[in-house]
């Protein structure tokens, strides 16, 4: 199966990216799928058009993170969106067959405008970003797209665009399927939505000492005011982190019973979480160190991967132009 997914370079990778996306990407890669993973730098401009000072830095950091987490350039194509100009051409052509009213009905359009109400998002680029997203997927004829639940609607719109193009012109595009992550979104360390603006994220490159300090300060079930007060793990962000960091069945039972009967304290629970987090993050930290030993490695990966992606995209665009009688 051909797989495609991407991330916007709007900051450092954090553990939400790891458990919500990157682990699934690696799994799909190791299952032998043909995987295309990219940095969506054009998509970053839809909400960060007014500050591009760190765009290049964040793009390279994202690729470093992909590599450190296990994306293998020998098995997957790793590329940068803006390096494949065919994405923009296909998005332009798709924009001819999608109505403005259809784009205004995309749920995330209003949600993001409301969430970022301090920014002027009344731009054409922000309105049509789902069209560019459809072009990102369809230009590689992807059959599967790993996404979170909040992106399923975008995959359905992509399927609609593929159907409409195939009906109007020629059978060029498959209809991709959403591949949902098994892990729900992690909350921030304070229990709220994980967000840089809240200061409640844990960066992947956090030091071991900082990780310990952060986890030990994490918010827990408000009902556990005293050590002797029983709690409910379902109301505790630490419990949600346990589920994401490979807690064993025996450990899970120990945490659940210990919390609900107050036979263990929150610090005991957090120490177990720390042990499991360090076990998962230690190889990633080591990979970052090895990657940084060669200052040219990341750029070489980007260059080679973008070249491979461009070759595939160019073939698709030949079919598209032929179907639309644009062969001049």
From Swiss-Prot:
GO terms for molecular function: ATP binding; tryptophan-tRNA ligase activity. A motif ('HIGH' region) lies at residues 9-17. It is an enzyme of class 6 (ligase). HAMAP family: Trp_tRNA_synth_B (MF_00140_B). It is found in: Cytoplasm. CDD domains: TrpRS_core. The keyword Membrane does not apply. This is Tryptophan--tRNA ligase. L-tryptophan binds at residue 136. One of its GO terms (biological process) is tryptophanyl-tRNA aminoacylation. One of its GO terms (cellular component) is cytoplasm. It catalyses: tRNA(Trp) + L-tryptophan + ATP = L-tryptophyl-tRNA(Trp) + AMP + diphosphate + H(+). Disulfide bonds: none annotated. The gene is trpS. SUPFAM superfamilies: Nucleotidylyl transferase. NCBIfam families: trpS. It comes from Thermotoga maritima (strain ATCC 43589 / DSM 3109 / JCM 10099 / NBRC 100826 / MSB8).
């Amino acid at each position: 199966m051909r797989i495609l997914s991407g991330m916007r370079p709007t900051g450092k990778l954090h553990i939400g990216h790891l458990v919500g996306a990157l682990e699934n990407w690696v799994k799909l890669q190791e299952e032998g799928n043909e995987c295309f993973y990219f940095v969506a730098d054009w998509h970053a401009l839809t909400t960060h058009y007014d500050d591009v000072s760190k765009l290049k830095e964040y793009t390279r950091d994202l690729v470093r993170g992909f590599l450190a987490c296990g994306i293998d350039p020998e098995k997957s194509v790793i590329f940068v969106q803006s390096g494949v100009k065919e994405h923009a051409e296909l998005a332009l052509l798709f924009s001819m067959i999608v109505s403005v009213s259809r784009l205004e009905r995309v749920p995330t359009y209003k949600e993001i405008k409301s969430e970022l109400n301090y920014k002027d998002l009344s731009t054409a680029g922000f309105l049509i970003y789902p069209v560019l997203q459809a072009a990102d997927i369809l230009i590689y004829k992807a059959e599967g797209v790993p996404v979170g639940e909040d992106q399923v609607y975008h995959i359905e719109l992509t399927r609609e665009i593929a159907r409409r193009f195939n009906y109007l012109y020629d059978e060029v595009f498959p209809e991709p399927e959403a591949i949902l992550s098994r892990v729900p979104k992690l909350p921030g360390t304070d229990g709220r939505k994980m967000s840089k603006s809240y200061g409640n994220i844990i960066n992947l490159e956090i030091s071991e000492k900082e990780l310990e300090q952060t986890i030990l300060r994490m918010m827990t079930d408000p009902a556990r005011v005293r050590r002797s007060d029983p709690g409910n793990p379902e109301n505790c962000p630490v419990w949600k982190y346990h589920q994401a960091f490979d807690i064993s069945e025996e450990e899970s039972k120990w945490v659940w019973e210990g919390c609900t009967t107050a036979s263990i304290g929150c610090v005991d629970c957090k120490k177990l979480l720390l042990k499991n987090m360090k076990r998962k993050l230690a190889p990633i930290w080591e990979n970052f160190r090895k990657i940084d030993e060669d200052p040219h490695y990341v750029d070489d990966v980007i260059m080679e991967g973008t070249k491979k992606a461009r070759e595939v995209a160019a073939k698709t665009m030949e079919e598209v132009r032929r179907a639309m009688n644009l062969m001049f």
